[in-house]
Regions:
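Hydrophobic alpha-helical transmembrane segments
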Residues: 321-333
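Transmembrane signal-anchor helices characteristic of membrane glycosylation enzymes that use polyprenol
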Residues: 25-28, 119-123, 245-257
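Membrane-embedded alpha-helical segments of multi-pass membrane proteins
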Residues: 28-46, 83-95, 163-171, 217-225, ...
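Alpha-helical transmembrane segments of multi-pass inner-membrane proteins
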Residues: 108-141, 147-148, 155-230, 241, ...
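Transmembrane signal-anchor hairpin modules in multi-pass inner-membrane enzymes, especially those
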Residues: 1-74, 80, 91-93, 97-115, ...
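Long extracytoplasmic/lumenal interhelical loops at the membrane interface
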Residues: 262-276, 280, 286-321, 340
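Membrane-interface helix caps and helix-loop-helix hairpins in membrane proteins
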Residues: 74-82, 209-210, 259
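Extracytoplasmic catalytic-loop and juxtamembrane helix elements of membrane-embedded
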Residues: 133-152, 259-274, 294
Length: 346
């Protein structure tokens, strides 16, 4: 109760709602959606969403985009896509409200909350992993990552790959806090916080290994390197590049340590087939796509591999939204990129 009273004394009602929304991300996704929807409709009633759109340049394109992809999904009877379209509208709108109420203290508290709850997710994932081992009559502790998705830990994040994506964010946030604490030679002044952040980072990296998601590792290394570049830590950037190169060399020499190495050839073949199916559908629906989750909606038509998306950040947007859809939302993103550029120059 003291924690709740403390938060209420430091933040207004909307800011407290944001902390609840962040915490809800660590619950099963259907509970997360319900909590976010309750908060969203509360803000609509309070006029917060309307003010967010009025005060944010090019934000009207969010409504145009969401309406377009919703109608496209309905036209093609892509019902999961129709639901996700409404989710896009809700989440985009919530970010506009956040911009109105953002403060350095709120931002820092949100990051601390995510870091703390990532420990909860890690503990849950390890317990989940122990139960997975018991399904194979493996007593004690074995560091084995299975190929089948149902035997890879996900910590309530829908599936192992989604949990791996979240871990990338957790580690990036920890890295940001590390950079912040070591800025201007402040290492010794924050030694306790740095040690805690380091331990939490290692815990999350261990759980990332348990997810068996191989592509998360180079993506994470690249993301941290970009953070160093933006922070002008060129020596550290060179260091992380060297570590990354050493890691590549190690796995080339010792491929048996790559998670799920036994099916890597099959995995590459599956990815290739997924992309081929996606490209086939793009050829016939290149203007509007078929809405969010298009791959999940169409894979059976092409005898494709069953999965939720096309596993490619370049193919999937075109597959789902088409050229017209991407052009509709482009002004909003361009405006935000300009704003970020101006911020970086100051």
């Amino acid at each position: 109760m003291d924690i709740i009273k403390n938060l209420k004394s430091r933040f207004d009602s909307v800011q407290c709602d944001f902390l609840i929304a962040i915490a809800a991300i660590f619950l099963p996704f259907y509970i997360t959606v319900v909590i976010h929807a309750i908060i969203f409709f509360k803000w609509i009633k309070q006029g917060e969403v309307k003010k967010g759109y009025e005060e944010t340049k090019r934000s009207k394109y969010i409504i145009f985009f969401s309406a377009l992809i919703f109608l496209t999904s309905v036209f093609y009877q892509n019902w999961p896509g129709a639901g996700v379209s409404l989710g896009y509208l809700m989440l985009y709108s919530m970010t506009l409200v956040y911009r109105r109420h953002a403060s350095e203290e709120l931002f820092d508290t949100m990051l601390n909350l995510v870091i703390g709850l990532s420990v909860f997710a890690s503990v849950w994932a390890i317990i989940e992993y122990i139960f997975i081992l018991r399904q194979f009559d493996l007593e004690g502790w074995y560091l084995v990552v299975f190929n089948a998705p149902q035997y890879r830990t996900n910590a309530m994040f829908f599936n192992a790959n989604y949990y791996a994506m979240m871990i990338e964010f957790f580690v990036a946030i920890c890295f940001y806090k590390f950079l912040k604490h070591t800025h201007n030679h402040g290492f010794m002044n924050h030694i306790k916080e740095i040690v805690i952040i380091g331990l939490i980072t290692l815990l999350n990296l261990f759980c990332l290994y348990l997810t068996g998601c191989r592509t998360a590792w180079p993506a994470l290394a690249g993301g941290l390197a970009i953070m160093l570049l933006f922070n002008r830590n060129y020596k550290s950037f060179g260091g992380i590049c060297a570590v990354g190169a050493a890691g590549v060399g190690f796995f080339i020499a010792k491929p048996q340590y790559i998670p799920r190495m036994s099916n890597i050839v099959k995995y590459l073949g599956v990815r290739k087939h997924i992309w081929e199916v996606a490209i086939q559908n793009i050829k016939t629906h290149f203007l509007f796509g078929e809405g969010p989750m298009t791959y999940w909606h169409i894979y059976a038509q092409y005898n494709g591999h069953p999965t939720q998306h096309s596993h490619n950040i370049f193919i999937d947007p075109v597959l789902c939204f088409g050229i017209i859809g991407l052009l509709v939302i482009a002004p909003f993103f361009i405006e935000n990129i300009k704003r970020l550029y101006r911020l970086l120059r100051t």
